[in-house]
Amino acid sequence: MERKDIRKRLARPAIKFAAGGFRPTQSDDESWLGKVFLFRPDETVPKNAAGIELHPYAQLYLPDLPFCSSALRGIRVLTVFISEPFPEPFEAMGDNWLIREYSFDEVLVRKDFASPDSPLKPFALKAELVEEDFPLWDGGGIPRDI
């Protein structure tokens, strides 16, 4: 198999995020690192088993991204929370980290839950399309016949 054929089979679109370096819009359709402000009316910041609030890690507004996986079709917003110390790699979601997903028909409200103890400084994210991204050779995602 020629190199160009391998590249064609492996290439996938992806998104590269840049944090900071521009003035945030403060609108609901902005993605953030270190800040979460969209919640269902009945939600608050999640807590771990010890009752300690998780830190806001990221909020991603999917409709404005230049690419979105078909696996996320119907999802408008993803929010991610993590504990400190940070969760272990491959740790099950729940106690030390949590992802919330919100569809287009869900009512979301802005809530300001300050997290003064968070090690993460909030930065708005700017998304850029990467037309061809490739899996790592040792990281999986490469068909056996290549």
Locations of the language-model features?
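Preference for intrinsically disordered or flexible, low-complexity segments
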Residues: 1-146
